[in-house]
């Protein structure tokens, strides 16, 4: 617990407990623990080093495996610790604010009964660890400590509960850090009343911040206040926690609900705190029982029902004789401020990691000052808090402060004053910290003569705001389970509601875009629509006065939601896109034209059913985005009149090709269920791989367990329909039986496979004969057939979707196990035989498709301007009327050179109404036509402006040339379309183009190449009346194969341009121009095109790269390697060792490297045979850089390349080395002079441990005296004038900095300069350099970059 007495995150425990409790082979009763059964393991040495407790615990010391040097059983029986008078027993009613005001809180308090404390707990007879799991969640991650190995583990609450309840335990585990505030358990545990009255979190911390807390765990990223108020401690028998002090000097309340505890207590005297610091830093906690080293140490026994209070700073250890369940909490208060701050200083001296400290400790001190000033002076220093008027403050009586509070406020000010600026942590809500400190000074002066007897009022000066505490509830397991079910249902409803709102919003946006671009011919926006809000469908009037009522009787009540496990019916989700509604509308209106109707005014599109009388309406155009509800009916729509009631509950329209309802819920309002594993394929039978992203997220592989996904290698290849699935029409299951529970269906497989089929388009489950029978009586019933998908069991494209053409509009549903990032699902558009007219040679130029939901909406604004609207609509109707006799398909990554031949039903299975979907060679499915059709070339002519209008085909690739032009290169449009479709993006795909001006003599349109598809500007082409053959011919013109080659096209013919004429794509020209651009502009140039990107990353343009203060991500490291700089600056970056090692091994030309203030572990990565021969190395202000680190860096590398072994350091060619502000001494200077023979510039400024002896090392080195020209010793306070005698031996020294060196006088520096043969002079008091000349000034400027 990061809090209560047994907290593993407490400062002391983070250092001491880890080693002392590790490897104990004796339990509390003196018996051998389970790890010590049989012969004890022989050890060669004892492990006495201090254990490290970091976030990455695996990077610390090895797990403690040694035995303790003392017996806990002996300490339990020793009479030395049976001391009286160190714990005060009290009744609950006696612990009040007046008691603390009078006596303070300096001694532990024991309450045998919780009566009078205001402490409320669940019933100990009924409340168990299983109830804790129920309240905090089975997936809540716990920090678990293995008592014997001292290894940090992470377990889910469910796993911990199973371990806790198991009778046989193979190891000792302890949970001491489960903070349950803002969880369901928070309401059933109420802290003592005295804690609620004085806890700074309740009375000081801003309430709006505490109310903003949403995270139930203790993640610092989501913590809005110090979340340490309520902890649950669960320990098994024989757990022991060594001596520690609770973090931040917090006090602790501790209630034993079940089991028992034993405490050893040591008072926080100055002597004991000093001994404690030495004991923690000694690393011998496992050998020494700290209670033996102090004068007074008392042992206290606690049993179930006892409540215990431990004051600030008390050193204590805990033992668990019986399995226990404990609730507790930590709190700061105003009656122990001095000791709280003193304990914080102990944490600094013992180097407790920040993870184990009180969160927001410094910020809390600022809020304490602000609250006291506002309460006693009326001045507000917090944002959003109003100050009190002087009259109001004058009317109040004078408040007397206790000496605990008065001296505490002074200590807080001094504590904050002594902190360095980067650690003052002034909260953003504090407006002016300086004014706040001044007001605190005035407050202390005003209350310095307060009388102590008048300060005992029984009322705390700082009061908690009303409503700061959650109401207490009696624990009821049944009610909690019901709340959990309701919460799951509510979350399901929220997810579904958000999805519907998102789809409706997209629909409105697309409708607005479409309504702005309509207004041609037969497409008219009439403003009729359906509004969907709060589960109620409302009608809006059409312009002619007729309305549409949706929802059976004009309204639809909000659906109720239940758990997925509460239903036995399986109905997969139905998805309905706008293009489907448009296809259905076109099919219904193909027999005749009525008044045009456009449903673009609402959040849902109402599709009309087929009109038997032939008086259907014209084309119905809707929004190009997602829609929430599309309703159909068999009502008649004639002459623009809309009559009847549209039934929202209809999932299928038996008459005509109306659109289908696309609900997100089943008929009972319950969420959909997914397919189940087949348990037969190789993926189902294998184990987790342990390497994929989902495995790395699993708890058992060390991940956080948030994704909740199965292994990618175990994703079933043939997922089956659940046995509870039923037909949507006859409501029978796949074996023609009444659906029953899954338990009774265990032997269903013995009766054969299920006969149900799931449509991959509309996701409707039905028997094939039931689906076909629903079409009886329609004009297309004879031709209605379905297409079976052999890649997925019980999957097909139902006859209804095939008849309406929806199976060509959308990609079929596929599973991640089959999905490849480079694969694209089929995009097919069916049209009639008239679509082949105008083809000169069967070659096509196919423009790229628009977004997923806009398959039949205009491709671009230029088409509308060119008058191609009528062509679209005319061809659309003809294509739908002729029953898709021609199919244009684009398979995954397969060029569509030849069409798929039509396969008649007789070729598959006699008179079967179900077609087959054969598998292609590459594993992708190729659909065979469900109608007999003639072979046709796979392609269609491009859209000509005002052309014949018989080709509205969208694909993402170039068709092969029939005249031997060869296959076209796959272009960037194809990859973009693949990514767009796989991500289900609704964004309209736009063709990327180079910003290149055409050369003289070209027409108004040009196509840009480099592997991309051609596109025309200002419409499709200039020739507005050219035929489809001319348009196709323009697309079949030869394209330049050179890099950057372009081919232009206009209505009169093709003109070709070589790459030499296009200077904007000439790499040589680009590099010359790029030399004049700053690096940030070069980064922008990389996103223009591939040619520019290759030219912009040329190493000649990136001789120097400055990545200081940047986050070292993988993309940044890759960018550095691509540019191959010679001078790399990584100052003030948190680069890791593995990152720097990876980087330097791939920069062989690197000469200058700067690593200022980088982690020392990263700097040690230079000790490798792969390090480039650097000439300049800057290690200034690297924390932890000492003599040992310098020795490691400058020693020969331990690794070697094949056939090569270095006997000298890889940094031996260094000419410049900067070590300013590091912790090196004279020993490091000796390493430098011995290992770097070519060193010319050495920077040792601000190195406080450098003395005359280190300078003497420079003077006695033959290489240094001959080659060293520049030396910086500024701010080296231990250097004296004797160092100048050694520096006089350096014959080449022409620059010396001795500024801020107090032991060197200016006169001695002047003498040194005058005795030199290099014509030196003294500037800026103690800076020795050569007399300035024009040439030397230019040569010296690089030192001050």
Curated annotation (Swiss-Prot):
Region span, Disordered: 1-44, 503-522, 816-848, 876-1053
Cofactor note: Binds 1 Fe(2+) ion per subunit.
Positions carrying Phosphotyrosine: 53
Residues noted as binding Zn(2+) 1 in the record, renumbered to the chain: 678, 681, 684, 716
Protein's UniProt name: JmjC domain-containing histone demethylation protein 1
Top EC category: oxidoreductase
Organism: Drosophila melanogaster (Fruit fly)
Binding site residues for Zn(2+) 2: 689, 692, 695, 711
Signal peptide stretch: none
InterPro entries, per the entry: F-box_dom, JHDM1_Histone_Demethylase, JmjC_dom, Leu-rich_rpt, Leu-rich_rpt_Cys-con_subtyp, LRR_dom_sf, Znf_CXXC, Znf_PHD-finger
